[in-house]
Amino acid sequence: MKTFSESHKTVFVVDHCPYMSESCRQHVEFDMLTKNRTQGIIPLAPISKSLWTCAVEASMEYCRIMYDIFPFRKLVNFIVSDSRSRTLNSWNREDQNLQELMAALAVIGPPNPRADPECCSILHGLVEAVESLCKITDFQHESRTALMGNADWVANRGRIICITNAKSDSHVQMLEDCVNETIHEHNKMAAGSDHLMQIQKCHLVLLHTYPVGEDSLVSDRPKKELSNVLVSEVHSVKAGRHLSTKLNQLVQLHFDLASTTITNIPMKPTLSVCDQEEQHANTSANYDVELLHHKEAHVDFIKSGEGYTGSSSIRENSLKETVTLKWCTPRTNSVELHYCTGAFRISPVDVNSRPSSCLTNFLLNGRSVLLEQPRKSGSKVISHMLSSHGGEIFLHVLSSSRSILEDPPSISEGCGGRVTDYRITDFGEFMRENRLMPFPEQSYQMDGGPEVPLERAKEQLERHTRYWPMIISQTTIFNMQAVVPLASVIVKESLSEEDLLNCQKTIYNLVDMERKNDPLPISTAGTRGKGPKRDEQYRIMWNELETLVRAHVSGSERHQRVMECLMACRSKPPEEEERKKRGRKREDKEEKGEKLNKDHEHDKKGQESERIKSVLDQEKEDLAEAEVIKDSPDSPEPPNKKPHIVIEDTGPAEKSKGPMSLLSLWSSRINTANSRKHQEFVGRLNSVNNKAELYQHLKEENGGEGVENGKASRQ
């Protein structure tokens, strides 16, 4: 069936009876000059609009927004009702514009307060509205012609918006009954006509408007289905700006519109004569403009998940949230912008305000405005752009994240491009076990009732996901092949005796692994050192296994027996605990021994480095003294001696047991160099500041005299 929604046809029925000429009692200041007033001049009194004027203005605003955003395929038929009904336009495309409607309303004029109210009724307009809905529009005629013999496949739906001043709830009910009966009568007439269409669905919206300050005689009522054809709802609204706000909310609901508020629009403020003397003319202020558009302009924005919740707010007198976007002046070329994923027509909410008109003229002159999401931190994100095409303004949606032309991201690509260890293989197996397929045979539950296959599939999916870690590093038991027999059957709705034995056997195997101190596949990612000790690893494993079994313990009696077996194996006997303590003490001793060996090696290396340093200093001193003796004229030439090699100092070369350290290489080099030198003189070894006293043994034997006589006799 070719579906035309209820928004395809909208019929406005406005009451033109004498009581609609009553004042709405909402005053409007007519004389706005409050400063520099000449003395003696009495200010003009405030004015107020009639109920008719408020109804016409609000309905025209509804039509303006609809025509701005949907210039095609959304049609309006305007009817006024007093002593008779008068249709101001038709469903033809040339009549679908505000100029035609306003010209027709000007001809009608305001209601006559002196007319006889008994002769006027809103029922004339409602009957005419039902008759208008039965007429075929150009779009419906094109669809019926294209379908040829299947013209009945084209649906006919519509909406009636009635603005009146009802007397009571019973009066409203009478209007609804009249519309319902009229629809059934006209459907019978349309069944035998080629120029009319039966109404499949009609949405009646009754707006009871009354002056400000009075009590409403009609109560609100949400949408209610009166028959298989008619759905009705009632709104009781004060006249004036309250009625305009209500119709603004309804147009958003009826046509799936969303609101976007553009903030920080730079614009010079409008100043009065007295204000211009106080404020410089070149100053500027930031203004806000609210725009309406189709809600699909926010779909990608909401999917991205960034900035939407923080940038949305509820405006005063507004039905829905409005998304706030900031005026942006980027320093980039238009070529560097992201791809445009959609363009939607816009309509300003307050079309007559100066900020709205300035923004509209700015865009119609060929300029574009980039809009960014307000963010507390980080770089700006340009998500939308305003631009005009062919005299119409569009809100363009820019791709603010990954381009739709790129390949989709990998399943293992997390936030910021970080690759995480998802259980991709296990998830593929999980999908195979829970895939949907046709269910050929009817099954029954335990109580005899039929079992719905979809509900059975949901229950199985719920059991399989009670405990299912998504990341490899967050689980131990799902990385162990020994736990697979238990993990694969514990998720069943009921266990057989064989399944119970397999689960118990798996638990006993884990106990045996713990007794043998076998290693477990514990992830040490992000940790320093060796990770948790062996008994700590098994404690983590047992806790996770208990979590898995406890999630399914209420499934059946055998599930409970698996849990009892697990708890019995976890409660170790005293000798087992004593063995564990001894094992922990042995591990602590081994760790302390390794630490002492490392400290001893470190001290040994320090002593070796000190010894090498002293030997190097001694070599430097020997070289300096040799240079002094050689340069002295009295010193004879030293005989050429073959270097004496001390064999006992050079032991057999040890075989390298691996890569040698720098200290070992340097020590080997120094030992080799020292072994090739002759034995040092005793006097030089015992010298002080490289000065050795000669004939010291004579002095010790004969005293100081012998030395002096010896010196004198030499002279």
UniProtKB/Swiss-Prot annotation:
Record protein name field: Integrator complex subunit 13
Broad class of where this protein is predominantly found: nucleus
Annotated gene: ints13
Similarity section: Belongs to the Integrator subunit 13 family.
Species the sequence originates in: Xenopus laevis
Residue ranges of the motif Nuclear localization signal (NLS): 581-591
Alphabetic keyword roster: Cell cycle, Cell division, Cytoplasm, Developmental protein, Mitosis, Nucleus
Organism ancestry: Eukaryota, Metazoa, Chordata, Craniata, Vertebrata
Subcellular location per the Swiss-Prot or TrEMBL entry: Nucleus; Cytoplasm
Note on domains (UniProt): The cleavage module binding motif (CMBM) mediates recruitment of transcription factors.
